[in-house]
């Protein structure tokens, strides 16, 4: 695992050292792959907003996307500074400002954001322009939705994280997208596969056409689980337990959610070369990324965002 001393610079290159920038992010990477990079963006007031992006998704030319960091917002204390949760005790106006900054930095319409309602399900909802603003400007009229899909340009899919796995889906043939939240419960119940199926049912998506990304989340070295969780994964991944579980010999296991989600997407028909997997762990990088485990629950939320370009 290497540490990259990363200045935020608007660049299409990999995470790199730009020490002349205004502040430095020392991101610890689990490997040297170039799956994602940090881009320095700006809100309308000129404030810097660093966003993590995937070259594989950008190469489609069809989407705006990002994964947020803790930096660039106005929240304080344990929520400092880019907290994207209205429900964890932060000041509502601060959170609204943070969402405005994200939208401005991405160049997407704030009023077209659509939120999940995450409860560790595998429910995927098809959203349209009629859903614009739900979660951020008005109440959602749906519950227990951990994944969103759409084929409407300009609608910003939004999901939220602090160790769980973000899953991005782009169908360049049918011009459709999906964004899902997959913690250990979602993963053991194959949320990635459920999202692929939802795209197939709604838009005729062929799995082999999909371009996918597995976003920043907790790594195998940081994610210790109990025997009952390990048993559930053993049942869900028969014959492949050793690819995703490390037995510590004390009734505890280290769980690899990244590899598990790679297997799920591959099993669903996504080509391995069409899957970009994060090399950033939220728990290893809790100074810059919110982590439930590292903070013992005293934290805000990160956000994943995905929009079809008009």
Residue ranges and their predicted role:
Residues 2-310:
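Active-site microenvironment for binding and transforming phosphate-containing groups
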């Amino acid at each position: 695992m290497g540490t990259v001393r990363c200045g935020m610079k608007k660049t299409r290159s990999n995470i790199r050292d730009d020490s002349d920038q205004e502040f430095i992010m020392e991101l610890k990477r689990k490997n040297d792959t170039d799956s994602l990079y940090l881009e320095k963006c700006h809100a309308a007031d000129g404030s810097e907003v660093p966003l993590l992006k995937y070259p594989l998704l950008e190469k489609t030319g069809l989407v705006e996307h990002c994964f947020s960091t803790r930096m660039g917002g106005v929240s304080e204390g344990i929520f400092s500074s880019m907290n994207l949760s209205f429900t964890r005790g932060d000041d509502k106006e601060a959170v609204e400002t943070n969402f405005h900054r994200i939208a401005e930095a991405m160049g997407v319409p704030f009023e077209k954001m659509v939120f999940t309602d995450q409860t560790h399900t595998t429910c995927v909802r098809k959203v349209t322009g009629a859903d614009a603003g739900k979660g951020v400007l008005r109440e959602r009229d749906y519950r227990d939705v951990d994944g969103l899909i759409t084929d409407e340009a300009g609608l910003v899919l939004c999901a939220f994280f602090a160790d769980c796995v973000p899953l991005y889906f782009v169908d360049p043939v049918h011009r459709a997208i999906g964004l899902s939240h997959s913690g250990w419960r979602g993963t053991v119940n194959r949320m990635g596969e459920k999202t692929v199926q939802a795209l197939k049912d709604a838009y005729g998506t062929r799995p082999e056409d999909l371009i996918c990304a597995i976003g920043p989340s907790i790594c195998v070295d940081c994610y210790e689980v109990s025997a009952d969780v390990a048993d559930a994964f053993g049942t869900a991944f028969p014959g492949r337990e050793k690819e995703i579980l490390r037995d510590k010999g004390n009734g505890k296991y280290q769980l690899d959610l990244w590899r598990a989600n790679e297997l799920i997407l591959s099993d669903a028909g996504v080509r391995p070369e069409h899957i970009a997997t994060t090399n950033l762990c939220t728990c290893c990088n809790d100074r810059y990324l919110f982590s439930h485990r590292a903070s013992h629950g005293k934290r805000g939320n990160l956000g994943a965002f995905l929009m079809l370009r008009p």
